[in-house]
Amino acid sequence: MGEGEEGDKFPPKTDEVTQESMKSARQLDFTGGSSDVEHSHSNQASSMAAASIPSPIVTVTRPIITSQAPPTVATPIPPPPQSQGIILHVPIRHPRPESPNSMPRPAGETRDGTPQKKKQCNCKHSRCLKLYCECFASGTYCDGCNCVNCFNNVENEPARRQAVESTLERNPNAFRPKIAASPHGGRDNREEVGDVVMLARHNKGCHCKKSGCLKKYCECFQANILCSENCKCLDCKNFEGSEVRQSLFHGEHSHNLAYLQHANAAITGAIGSSGFASAPPPKRRKGQEIFFNQGTKDSSTHRLGQANNGRTTSSQTGSRAGGNASLGPSKVVYKSLLANIIKPMDVKALCSVLVAVAGEAAKTLTEKRLANQKETSVASSVQDQGHVNNKAEKSGLEDSNADGSKGRSLSPETLALMCDERDTMLMVAASPNCSVEPTSQLPNGQDQVYAEQEKVVLTKFRDCLNRIISCGEVKESNCSMSRMDLDTPVQTTVRIDPVVQQAPVANGVSQTAKQPSQLNTTTPNTSSQTANGVSQTAKQPSQLTTTTTTPNTSSQTHLHKTPALSEKKDL
């Protein structure tokens, strides 16, 4: 009976616990398990499958409840923290896409030419909400920067959003990247390092002055693009066809640069420095062009009332023109005067010519050697015959044994020595410049053929260089003449034609007078005035001393009566 009573006590406990467990399951399904309910409705399960679903739940809960009754209260506790965590993360994720860059770049992302490390700002008074803050301008939050009182973070998102909106109202392109249409492919994917896609261009331009736009702090060079019209750099070398830029990207930078500098210095010293004048003319802005055009129009339409100030105004207009030319962003680009003269084909032809000349020199030298050897052989044969004759004479002297008044007979040893000395003297006299040995060498250990070839090649190369220098001088003179032609219109003075002024009518006759011109003239100007019907001419003093004077009357008047005078006579 005890076992039956115990068995009777267990079922109601299990029912109560199953109800609590079902309530907790419903709560879980209500909060986060709605997707499971929708999934069960969409599958259209049968009534038998629906009845089989609660049975495993009861079977699973029974051993857990029978083994440990107290922990049943703690089982529904773990799910609520997960739901709370999900709710807390939702408001943090929403505002991020509303930043200027919807896809923020990671700190260590590598872009074309940009450094791997993220730049850190050092703002102190702007709260990192101005465009000169690099983090704010790039649309990223400050992370590990050295800024003070920073508002460019998640905690101050409302203030940051307000600053972004106000900035966009003032300038819609404020958060646009500096380099438009830049290629995002890596440098390794390109054919050669330094080959630039021409679509990329800097929107604002660089302001380099001393680096030649070939350093990392030049934004155009850093992004691997060429400098454009927007740039305001000086002495730029980051343009298409720049030899310095090509040598920088194609290895052996220091050696190639040194060779180029030495070559340019030599060409400049031999020809001239007009290679710097081959740069395009300076560009003016629209406002400056309008101002310059107005100045020229004002000078061309000068009135006679301002004739006394003609010289000052013309000088002012000339100074304005010069000022406008200097204010424009002038790029002094060095281009060698021999850039379009010397070509690779010419260099190859020169090398072939030098090789041919060296071969001809060796051939002529061998021919000379053979001729010299023949001459030496003929001379040696003549010397042998002379030696035989000398021996015969000596033998005759020995046979005679006659002592002269001033001399006496010599011994045979002395005669032999004297004959050897004569033979050596004759040999040296026969070949003073040419050696008898076929393989003669110079004191430096070089063959005479090599020395002759070197001499001929150097002389030929010198003649070629002289021709190139003459061509460069001709081109330099043409460049200087063209530059003078460009400068002459600015220096020309404006010619002011004299304007005849109409004087008031006196006694029915118009009086005209010509004012003296401010320009250099050789003839004086005279004016005529008519008073009471008589024309009067008066000479104006000339500004320059002249030998001959020719009076020029400005006007001729004819006498005629006016209706006013006729009416008076009738009255």
UniProtKB/Swiss-Prot annotation:
Tissue: Ubiquitous but expressed mostly in flowers.
GO molecular function, one term: DNA-binding transcription factor activity
Subcellular location: Nucleus
Region (Disordered): 1-52, 92-119, 293-325, 370-411, 507-571
Alphabetized InterPro entries for the sequence: CRC, Lin-54_fam, Tesmin/TSO1-like_CXC
Annotated Polar residues bias: 293-319, 373-388, 508-539
Main location: nucleus
Pfam families assigned to the protein according to its UniProt record, in alphabetical order: TCR (PF03638)
Keyword Transmembrane helix: no
Cellular component, GO annotation: nucleus
Positions of the CRC domain: 117-241
Compositionally skewed regions (Basic and acidic residues) per UniProt: 7-16
Biased composition (Low complexity): 540-557
UniProt KW keywords: Developmental protein, Metal-binding, Nucleus, Zinc
Transmembrane segments: none
Family classification: Belongs to the lin-54 family.
Free-text function comment from the UniProt entry: Plays a role in development of both male and female reproductive tissues.
Domain notes: The cysteine-rich domain CRC binds zinc in vitro.
Protein name listed in UniProt: Protein tesmin/TSO1-like CXC 6
Encoding gene per record: TCX6
